[in-house]
Amino acid sequence: MSSKEQEAQKGKQGWITPTVIPPEEWATFRYRGKTLEELLNMSMDEFIKLLPARQRRSLKRGLKPEHRKLLEKIRKAKRLAAQGKKVVIRTHCRDMIILPEMVGLTIHVYNGITYIPVFISPWHIGHYLGEFALTTKIVQHGEPGLKATRSSLHIAAK
């Protein structure tokens, strides 16, 4: 296999099963030149200025009630995690923008059928939760056989 084919295969695998970057490597993270610690210490208004236009505009309008409720759940889960208890955060809010305070948590995002666990790393900041819980499967076509096409309807089954 050539190097290009290997790179393409790696890319496919990374897309189908996203790789999780371990917390030890988070020290190298920068978002618009800011470290994770700097982002966590910023006010919401300062953070909003760093976001792309679509997300910035959405957050300037204010959070929806569902998003506020999700943030309360996240803060409660962080408090309980400090005490040693584990809380599962489930949400239908696919349009929630990932904020720095969500980093390190696993949020179960609804994709229309089930809840998909999404581990949030610093590289997810500024994206939407729904981007990481795909709503459709990747099509893998099977082999043609009986009843696969209209012409095969006239072939006698054994």
UniProtKB/Swiss-Prot annotation:
A molecular-function term among this protein's GO annotations: structural constituent of ribosome
GO cellular component: cytosolic small ribosomal subunit
Keyword Disulfide bond: no
Alphabetized Pfam families for the sequence: Ribosomal_S19
Swiss-Prot/TrEMBL GO biological process terms: ribosomal small subunit assembly; translation
InterPro entries named among the record's database cross-references: Ribosomal_uS19, Ribosomal_uS19_CS, Ribosomal_uS19_euk/arc, Ribosomal_uS19_SF
Keyword annotations: Ribonucleoprotein, Ribosomal protein, RNA-binding, rRNA-binding
Function: Protein S19 forms a complex with S13 that binds strongly to the 16S ribosomal RNA.
Family according to the record: Belongs to the universal ribosomal protein uS19 family.
Name by which UniProt lists this protein: Small ribosomal subunit protein uS19
